[in-house]
UniProtKB/Swiss-Prot annotation:
Compositional bias ranges of the Pro residues kind: 196-210
Protein's organism: Coprinopsis cinerea (strain Okayama-7 / 130 / ATCC MYA-4618 / FGSC 9003)
Domain PAS: 423-495
Record protein name field: Transcription activator of gluconeogenesis ERT1
The UniProt record lists the keyword DNA-binding: yes
Composition-biased stretches (Polar residues): 48-61
Gene name linked to the record: ERT1
Biased composition (Low complexity): 1-39
DNA-binding region, residue range(s): 77-105
GO biological process: cellular response to starvation; gluconeogenesis
Residue ranges the record marks as coiled coil: none
Length: 541
């Protein structure tokens, strides 16, 4: 009988490709087995036993503190607290001992918060604050200014630099305006612009030996009205707050102010208060800066007087000025004239004109008659289209005119008419200096003032233009009338332009056209109503 050997294990299927030798297969298998059999390397952990004791440490170890830890002090001393340094509880502390200031080592003061204070401490804090407020600092002596002194005036003591401007030049009682605020403003301006030299000391009484005297007229005209202007204006040089100038020793400071401010007559001024002592003036209580110098119902009503001469009055009357011109006479010669000699009243031409305006204007001006005449005049000259253009222009500014006139009372309208008449006086004087053909009319077109040059240009007589009720659009050609009303409607309540320039054709009495360039400006009254129109023409040659 035969024994059967076991079947060998099946080989892996051969890969496609070239056949390999048995030696190569053995090498590959041996290399793979060696890779799988080798264990993976692990990082060795160093234990305290394995580490060498004598090796240097990688990092330096912290040095152990010698002695007990320093305890923080509950409260630092004053010097350590001020220097923001660490202190200890011992007194004197070690730091002060090292610095050699052990004798001054004291407890520092720590400020408590308000919510931590006790009631007693709160009361003490309030009392200390009230006491600090109650103690007012003593007033320091003010720096003193100085103005050069006239050589003819004796000086008994030197005056510091800033004294005179504070006590005399800036004295609000020097000038006789309605309020001391205006007096102070004018006195400062007078000091800045420079003051004229005072009059000769021979015309004034000798001053006391203990006081210096100064005269401060801001205008030469002051000497003509004040016989006491050359007398003493005393001021104390020990107290800049004391006012020593007589309250009624100066008249108005400018020529134009004579008609605006009340003033004493010479007889009144020479009789009252001329010999009052210095103490009586300095003892008067100072007024409030806005308080008037005199009550309105007690102000003297005498008109200003002039002692210059008859020539001044005739000059003013011939020119129709509201204010008299400055005199050529020197202040000293005028001040030496005694009161009552050559005393001639002011010209009454300007005053009479103003008084006549106040007496004549008793009711407001009726503007409705001017518009009624315009509505009657348009159909007689214009076609329908031109009439519509004029009416449309009137409709533009009519609502604004009514809205501004509604709140006005009867007194307001009378006041507006008085202002209008006064403006005509000023414009009449201005037109007399100009050679340009000029006409002034109301907003309705009624002519109020005509320059002679306009009469020469248009050959219209002055009596017919001003004496009768003549309207400016009656002198215009038709197209110029329409353009005028359209321009007036556009600029009656406009603030961007003050004057309107255009062309205009004027008509002579016989109907001959006069082409010219035309410029007119609209003036408004106190209530912003267009009340006056000023027109000027230049002929086109």
């Amino acid at each position: 009988m035969f024994a059967v050997a076991p079947r060998p294990a099946p080989l892996a299927p051969a890969q496609a490709g070239p056949s390999t030798s048995p030696q190569q297969t053995l090498k590959k298998s041996s290399s793979q087995s060696s890779i799988t059999s080798a264990p993976t390397k692990r990082r060795r952990t160093v234990t305290p036993e394995d580490s060498p004791q004598d090796s240097a440490p990688s990092q330096p170890q912290k040095k152990a503190r010698e002695g007990p830890k320093k305890k923080k002090a509950n409260r630092a001393c004053f010097h350590c607290q001020k220097a923001h340094l660490t202190c200890d509880d011992s007194r004197p502390c070690q730091r002060c001992i090292k610095r050699g200031i052990a004798n001054n080592c004291r407890e520092g003061h720590r400020k408590k918060a308000k919510y931590l204070l006790d009631d007693d401490e709160l009361e003490a804090l309030k009392r200390s604050k009230e006491g600090a407020k109650g103690k007012a600092p003593e007033p320091q002596p003010q720096p003193q200014l100085h103005q050069p002194v006239v050589a003819t005036m004796p000086i008994s003591e030197p005056v510091p630099q800033s004294e005179q401007l504070l006590t005399t030049a800036f004295d609000p009682t020097t000038f006789a305006f309605g309020s001391e605020a205006a007096n102070l403003e004018y006195s400062i301006l007078s000091a800045i612009l420079g003051n004229p030299s005072p009059p000769d000391s021979a015309s004034s009484p000798p001053p006391p030996p203990s006081q210096s005297h100064y005269s401060w007229p801001s205008d030469p005209l002051d000497f003509t009205a004040s016989p006491r202007l050359g007398t003493s204006f005393t001021s104390s040089y020990t107290d800049a707050q004391q006012l020593s100038i007589s309250s009624d020793s100066v008249l108005s400071t400018s020529p134009s102010a004579q008609f605006l401010n009340y003033s004493y007559s010479q007889q009144q001024r020479s009789d009252e208060g001329s010999d009052l002592p210095y103490s009586q003036y300095s003892a008067q209580a100072p007024l409030h800066p806005l308080q008037p110098r005199y009550p309105l119902d007690q102000r003297p009503r005498s008109p200003p007087t002039s002692t210059v001469g008859e020539k001044v009055s005739t000059d003013v009357a011939s020119r129709g000025l509201l204010t008299p011109p400055l005199s050529n006479a020197s202040p000293s010669s005028i001040a030496s004239v005694p009161p009552g000699v050559a005393e001639i009243p002011q010209p009454k031409s300007a005053v009479s004109h103003l008084q006549s305006i106040n007496d004549r204007v008793t009711k407001p001006y009726d503007y409705t008659e001017g518009y009624h005449f315009l509505m009657k005049h348009l159909p007689t000259r214009f076609e329908k289209n031109d009439i519509l253009r004029v009416v449309r222009a009137l409709a533009i500014f009519r609502p604004s005119l009514i809205a501004l006139q509604m709140p006005l009372s009867l007194d307001d309208e009378i006041f507006v008419e008085k202002c209008f008449q006064r403006s005509l006086l000023e414009l009449g004087k201005l037109i007399s200096y100009s050679g340009t053909p000029t006409v002034v009319w109301r907003r309705t077109g009624e002519i109020c003032l005509v320059a002679p040059e306009f009469c020469m240009l248009t050959e219209w007589p002055m009596e017919e233009l001003v004496g009768r009720r003549k309207y400016i659009y009656e002198l215009f050609e038709n197209q110029s009338v329409v353009e005028y009303w359209e321009n007036f409607a556009s600029h009656a309540f406009e603030n961007t332009t003050r004057s309107v320039y255009s062309h205009c054709v004027l008509l002579k009495p016989d109907g001959t056209p006069v082409p010219a360039t035309f410029c007119f400006s609209i003036r408004r009254d106190l209530f912003d109503l267009p009340s006056m129109v000023i027109g000027q023409w230049l002929p086109l040659l």
